[in-house]
Amino acid sequence: GKGRTDYLLCVKVEAVPKSLPVAVLEAKRESEDPLKGMQQAKGYADCRRHDVKYVFATNGHRYGEFDKFTGLQGGPFPFPDFPNHPDLTARYAGDTGIDVHTPEAAILFMADSPAYPESRYYQDAAIRAAFEKIINCRKRGDTAHVLLSMATGSGKTIIAANLLWRLHEAECLPTPALFLCDRDELREQAYTRLKAVFGDNARIVETRNGKNAAQNARIHIATYQTLGLDDEAEEVASFLTKHYAEDAFSVIIIDECHRSAWGKWSEVLKRNPNAIHIGLTATPRQLRESKQRTAEDVEITANNIKYFGDPVYEYTLIQAQEDGYLAACEIVRRKPSIDWKTFTSEQVLAAGAVDARTGRPITAEDLTKDEYSAPSFDDKLMLPERVKAMCGDLFEQLCKNGGPEQKVIVFCNREIHADRVAMQLNNLYVKWCREKDRTPKEHYAFKCMGGKNNGADMIVPLRGSGQRAFVACTVDLLEAGVDIERLNAVVFFRYLQSPIKFYQMLGRGSRIYEETGKYKFWLYDYTGVTELFGTDFITRPPRPKPDKP
């Protein structure tokens, strides 16, 4: 559990605070063959998971080994021939090209920050993998571009904080570092984490009295909107160019780099060509190839790989759940009976459909096709009876699995759809309270969209206690990055074709919350989105047959 292994074998350099793991040693019973269980696939997996180069197994008399670089297994060998510390140090240097005694390698041996001193094994492995690439890029005279693929909820911001701290301690931050994200909520979360490490030397980039409030800080935290990276073409990067010279940063970390890095905010990378560029993503590289995978997903993945290279370290949702760091996911597949049929244009009119974008009743002139199927519902057409049926079934499921007063996100197709879903769920909740002789709590279900007075202010109480703000009905405001540890359920009333979006949305429920005993979350799928799961994931749990509400 939790990624533990029998032993980690480390290289130690005198007068440095931290050791460098280079191998895993599996201890076996004396009576067992030391090569038992040392399949090639397992060797590769152990090396990847711990970012080590070798795997050894021994029964105390003989040993076997797996070498990541050659892909070969060896043994059994007599135990007296087992490599000692100088042997492993020399072998690591020869295979990686990194001499651990040089100043360039110092970052590998720096301790984590006092704010986050006990990294989880995969967080430490991710930082080591990033540093190894940075060291080798610098040796070649290349700019270091590093990609880390970490499951949502695995602590990407803590990884960033400790990575920057270790660079700082190794005197590798000659100029400030920039942490760049695309939403205010992510900026505030990053600021909280980075301030815990760097204190007042971590500042949010904003205008104050006509000046950059972060100008004297070591760590600058910004959204690309603040830097002016979403300006019109003639004013691209207005704040960036006004307040920052070229090559102003020594390190740039781009959070959720799969979302927008290839739009205008790539300007910040171009203006800092000599900085270390680090991309953080929660999107798994291996997505199921299917007709549902969108052209946009293909382009995003290709762009990430082209710019950053392959991820130097990957920590998947499955691995995090197996390790016990993220909540398990219980899938409930539902499908409204209305979705099994195809509607003629006459039936659409008879059902009282409304325009999903404007809310006005559909007329015959609006219907350009002879037939309409489920994916058209709620994105283009909204059938009031369908919304009512789905909300009724969801409320019944919530009552059955923990009660209605639990924290839930419902992903809807459009804003009007979110409005109608919130209204239906509120009505159902009021009726439930009346039947139970209970006083309804405030803001049970609410629309949560971007913009002022449009529900975004309810994110704080949604995160908070169980006294109000239970069900957030949104389109995509909460799809990524916002930490809601109390979240008990993620609901899809929305049709999706993008695995990237699906994984982001799913990740909202994956955090464990020990205070309420939350170690799993529910995924209610009303639109077949779980078909976007990677094949390795959908083997656990078994796929239930869909029920018809």
Region spans (language model):
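ATP-dependent helicase/translocase motor core
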Residues: 1-176, 181, 185-200, 215-219, ...
